[in-house]
């Protein structure tokens, strides 16, 4: 068993070479793990600027109940916004919270900038007593354009949506049953089956880049690249491969 009754650091200082600027903060928390269950708390609060990271997590063997509450928040001009090159360096908040039995756990995710939602949705994990595989379902969407350089906003438009569903087994086999990613100029659909060891058994990926009304600038590094329409399909099936 592991037990950390109380962590209470009144002054934590990091120099500029570590994260790009000097940081002063307090750090508190606790940890208890015994017989496969436990709980953990962590709170990091800056004292020189308005920013914090807090985490509360727990799991109980008797009820198989899992709890998770993660919050990351920083005021305008914070480290994360600056490191990511977000225009205007807005205030950012990322929250991930959920509670439920281990065989049907769901969490909600929310990302906001300057108080406006940018990405939100649900992540669900499902297990079955007669299978060692864990299924996952992800459904996220939002307006990411304000977080991007102005020249790329037409590509993403006002809504970007990600949906994915699949499973991961105890034998390290990974199945991606469905993948869907859509924005104003992008549509991606795909699926894959990955064998233990990371070897693909099959995959299929269809990508369409097209913007109504004309050419669109691709959000890639290097020289500016505009396309009117691009369609790419990648497919592989081990059972049909000559190799």
Question: Which residues fall in each region the model found?
Answer:
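Short, intrinsically disordered, charge-balanced linker/junction segments flanking boundaries
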Residues: 1, 232-243
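Elongated, acidic membrane-bridging lipid-handling scaffolds
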Residues: 1-102, 112-116, 123-131, 194-196, ...
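Residues that define the transmembrane beta-barrel architecture of outer-membrane proteins
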Residues: 23-25, 51, 90-92, 158-160, ...
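Repeated loop/turn-to-beta-strand initiation elements of outer-membrane beta-barrel proteins
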Residues: 36-41, 64-65, 103-107, 172-176, ...
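Membrane-embedded beta-strands that build the outer-membrane beta-barrel scaffold
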Residues: 40-42, 55, 68-70, 94-98, ...
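Short, flexible domain-boundary/linker segments around small modular repeats
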Residues: 147, 156-165
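Outer-membrane beta-barrel translocator/channel fold
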Residues: 151, 217-221
């Amino acid at each position: 068993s592991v037990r950390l009754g109380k962590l209470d650091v009144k002054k934590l200082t990091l120099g500029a070479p570590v994260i790009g600027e000097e940081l002063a903060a307090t750090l508190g928390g606790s940890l208890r793990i015994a017989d496969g269950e436990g709980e953990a708390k962590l709170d990091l609060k800056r004292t020189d600027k308005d920013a914090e990271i807090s985490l509360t997590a727990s799991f109980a063997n008797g009820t198989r109940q899992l709890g998770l509450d993660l919050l990351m928040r920083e005021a305008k001009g914070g480290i994360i916004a600056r490191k990511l090159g977000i225009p205007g360096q807005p205030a950012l908040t990322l929250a991930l919270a959920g509670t439920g039995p281990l065989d049907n756990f769901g969490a909600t995710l929310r990302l906001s900038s300057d108080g406006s939602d940018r990405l939100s949705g649900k992540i669900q994990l499902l297990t079955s007593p007669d299978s060692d595989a864990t299924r996952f379902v992800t459904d996220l969407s939002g307006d990411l354009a304000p977080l991007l350089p102005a020249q790329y906003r037409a590509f993403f438009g006002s809504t970007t949506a990600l949906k994915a569903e699949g499973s991961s087994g105890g034998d390290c086999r990974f199945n991606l049953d469905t993948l869907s990613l859509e924005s104003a100029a992008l549509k991606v659909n795909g699926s894959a089956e990955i064998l233990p060891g990371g070897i693909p058994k099959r995959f299929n990926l269809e990508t369409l880049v097209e913007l109504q009304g004309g050419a669109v600038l691709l959000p890639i590094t290097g020289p500016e690249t505009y396309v009117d329409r691009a369609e790419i399909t990648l497919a592989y099936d081990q059972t049909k491969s000559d190799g």
